[in-house]
From Swiss-Prot:
Protein name according to UniProt: Protein phosphatase EYA3
Localization in the cell: Cytoplasm; Nucleus
Signal sequence coordinates: none
Chief location: cytoplasm
Cofactor(s), names only, from the UniProt record: Mg(2+)
The species this protein was found in: Gallus gallus
GO molecular function, one term: protein tyrosine phosphatase activity
Role noted for this protein: Tyrosine phosphatase that specifically dephosphorylates 'Tyr-142' of histone H2AX (H2AXY142ph). 'Tyr-142' phosphorylation of histone H2AX plays a central role in DNA repair and acts as a mark that distinguishes between apoptotic and repair responses to genotoxic stress. Promotes efficient DNA repair by dephosphorylating H2AX, promoting the recruitment of DNA repair complexes containing MDC1. Its function as histone phosphatase probably explains its role in transcription regulation during organogenesis. May be involved in development of the eye.
Reaction catalysis annotation: O-phospho-L-tyrosyl-[protein] + H2O = L-tyrosyl-[protein] + phosphate
Cofactor comment text: Binds 1 Mg(2+) ion per subunit.
Length: 119
């Protein structure tokens, strides 16, 4: 029961801040995060901006969703998604952690949920 409550609370926080992670941070941390994102964009030739555009395009298509599978534990993975500003393109129910169950199980769950005929 405690685990279910914990995940409900995590979901509430994720959904509340998925488009504004800065709301979780102090003004100084928010500014530092923005500087860090800017530096990352410069160093990676706008990787994050390009990735976000691609993910938004996929999300805008009929019958298309973005799914993230990670080997990071779920809560830290959710934090990273928010910090990178990708919460709006990855609904929490489409983020899978393979840490405890493995990638194969994640793919089985996705196939069970969406079917085999996917692109």
């Amino acid at each position: 029961r405690k685990l279910a409550f914990r995940y409900r609370r995590v979901r509430e926080i994720y959904d509340k801040y998925k488009t504004n992670v800065g709301g979780l941070l102090s003004p100084q941390k928010r500014e530092a995060l923005q500087r860090l994102r800017t530096d990352i964009e410069v160093l990676t030739d706008s990787w994050l901006e390009t990735a976000l555009k691609s993910l938004l395009l996929i999300q805008s298509r009929k019958n298309c969703v973005n799914i993230l599978i990670t080997t990071t534990q779920l809560v830290p993975a959710l934090a990273k998604v928010l910090l990178y500003g990708l919460g709006e393109v990855f609904p929490i129910e489409n983020i899978y952690s393979a840490t405890k169950i493995g990638k194969e199980s994640c793919f089985e769950r996705i196939v069970s949920r969406f079917g085999k005929k996917v692109t």
